[in-house]
């Protein structure tokens, strides 16, 4: 099974830059709960669980960290799909996730306008299921990725909106 992520950056969610901060806990628990369901299905079907992240700050990194935290399950494979070389390379967890990744794909040598959209389409094309950490606003990259997944007939699982309210 192949699971992708689309979700907002920490600023839009009103959350700290560090995705391991306790304020991220409700979202991290939701991700882990969803991944646990997929692990069961994959185990029953004797297949790997492939996780696809775009490596943007916020939801993408939180998803990758959750996947890596389940390292005791050998069948989990982390695929980091970057729109361009060195994308988000100053992020606190960049080097750690690069070391843990099964696959590290840089879709372009340089950043260009629209390269994020190419990365998002790559993830939609690869995944069977898309987890969406979305605030409900029909604008921006997360919304466009959801629309791409809908048009492609992908299963989409939405993070409950009550978890997105920064308390």
Descriptions of predicted regions:
Residues 1-166:
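Acidic/glycine-enriched connector segments
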């Amino acid at each position: 099974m192949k699971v992708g992520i689309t979700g907002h950056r920490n600023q839009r969610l009103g959350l700290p830059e560090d995705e391991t901060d306790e304020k991220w806990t409700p979202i991290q628990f939701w991700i882990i709960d969803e991944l646990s369901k997929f692990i069961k299905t994959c185990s029953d079907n004797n297949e790997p669980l492939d996780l696809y992240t775009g490596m943007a700050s916020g939801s993408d990194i939180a998803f990758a960290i959750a996947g890596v935290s389940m390292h005791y399950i050998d069948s989990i494979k982390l695929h980091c799909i970057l729109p361009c070389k060195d994308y988000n390379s100053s992020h606190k967890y960049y080097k750690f996730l690069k070391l843990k990744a099964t696959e590290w794909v840089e879709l372009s040598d340089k950043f260009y306008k629209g390269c994020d959209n190419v990365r998002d389409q790559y993830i939609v094309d690869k995944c069977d299921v898309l987890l969406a950490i979305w605030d409900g606003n029909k604008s921006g990259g997360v919304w466009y990725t959801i629309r791409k997944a809908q048009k492609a007939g992908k299963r989409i699982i939405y993070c409950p909106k009550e978890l997105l309210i920064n308390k």
